[in-house]
Amino acid sequence: NIYPVKGYSITVGLNDEASQAAAPQVSLLDDETKLVTSRLGKDRFRVAGTAEFNGIDLDIRADRIKPLVNWVNECFPGVDTRRVEPWAGLRPMMPTMLPRVGAGKKANVFYNTGHGHLGWTLSAITAHQLAGHVLQNMGQTVRSFSTPTPAAAAA
């Protein structure tokens, strides 16, 4: 079975020069709190973390957002957190935390799901592997990501 796991994030509006200067320019991972950050251009900063097993529920709980805001205030005191946009979304996850990648029980049905919080990280490579499996069954091959297309090789 695949289960919905709710993840939370906040996007902090960096509305002034002091906040823009105080927010990190690179992505960070706080191993202790398991929070990750991404700078989104000049005027936005995202902090994401936490996981909640709560069925198909997209309600945004204040008690899940507050620690994210507090973390920004503690780690980056120069960032103004008065303008914060909370978000919650469901990520498909398997109980084993391993994605389901491969053929389904019915003909021509294939799965590439259940990556959980590593969806953006792993889904491209597992899609590539799955494409290879599908094409191999059709008697074809799939080019690797680094193989230039014929048009690119001719240029």
Regions found by a protein language model. Name each.
Residues 14, 98-155:
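C-terminal lid/capping helical subdomain adjacent to the catalytic/cofactor pocket in oxidative enzymes
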